[in-house]
Amino acid sequence: MQALLFLMALLLPSGAGAEEIIGGVESRPHSRPYMAHLEITTERGFTATCGGFLITRQFVMTAAHCSGREITVTLGAHDVSKTESTQQKIKVEKQIVHPKYNFYSNLHDIMLLKLQKKAKETPSVNVIPLPRPSDFIKPGKMCRAAGWGRTGVTEPTSDTLREVKLRIMDKEACKNYWHYDYNLQVCVGSPRKKRSAYKGDSGGPLLCAGVAHGIVSYGRGDAKPPAVFTRISSYVPWINRVIKGE
């Protein structure tokens, strides 16, 4: 139930709380050219935001719980409160949610967005590599999460892209999440540190040695780590089939 409440909190009206980076730093402008900012019109007509990342010129990866009636993707952004010359705004043609996604267990929290047109590759807009199915990220490794989410439980969302270093944890650290599945998810963030992804960062990447290994999925409502990320390597065959149009 705790995880469910946190997921529900992610899709609040824009500016009132979609997820953010806690304990991190502002990213060097345009140093993460694969980052995508999603503006979502929900089924009830509200506006929400999520993160995402470009995996081909026409596909963005994000979390399944970031789906909505309509989504516009902004690529090449650093400060989303401004209209930057580097930005490319592209509407989503099709939202492909994983067929086994379960809102209540949060399993299979992955979605691909097919853009109406291909993104133009520039120094500020580019794709990020995905892992191979055999690339099973192990506990102890230091990775990074990035996003425009809240910088604190009571803080607003960030206009500028931020990032934070996070440690991959053993599955025991996430044992209090009832439906946590080590084969499908990654337990991220040391309970000893005040560093985490939070509201507004949902759908953003977990970056390990230049490869996207995870997707921000859910965590505690009070933002205390660890949080749960979708394990991308487990979904590579499905991702490839979707991109190929199968």
Swiss-Prot record:
Pfam families in the cross-refs: Trypsin (PF00089)
Enzyme type, top EC level: hydrolase
Gene3D superfamilies the UniProt entry points to: Trypsin-like serine proteases
Lineage: Eukaryota, Metazoa, Chordata, Craniata, Vertebrata
Activity control: Also inhibited by lima bean trypsin inhibitor, soy bean trypsin inhibitor and human plasma alpha1-antichymotrypsin.
Deletion consequences: Mice display an impaired ability to inactivate thrombin or degrade fibronectin in peritoneal cells.
pH dependence: Optimum pH is 9 at high salt concentrations.
CDD domains referenced in this protein's UniProt entry, alphabetically: Tryp_SPc
Signal peptide as annotated in the record: 1-18
Protein name as it appears in the record: Mast cell protease 4
Keyword terms: Disulfide bond, Hydrolase, Protease, Serine protease, Signal, Zymogen
Proregion residues excised on maturation: 19-20
Annotated GO biological process: proteolysis; regulation of angiotensin levels in blood
Molecular function GO terms recorded: peptidase activity; serine-type endopeptidase activity
Family: Belongs to the peptidase S1 family. Granzyme subfamily.
Keyword Ion transport in record: no
Residue pairs linked by disulfide bridges in the UniProt entry: 50-66, 143-208, 174-187
Gene: Mcpt4
Summary of subunit composition and partner proteins: Monomer. Interacts with iripin-2, a serine protease inhibitor from Ixodes ricinus saliva.
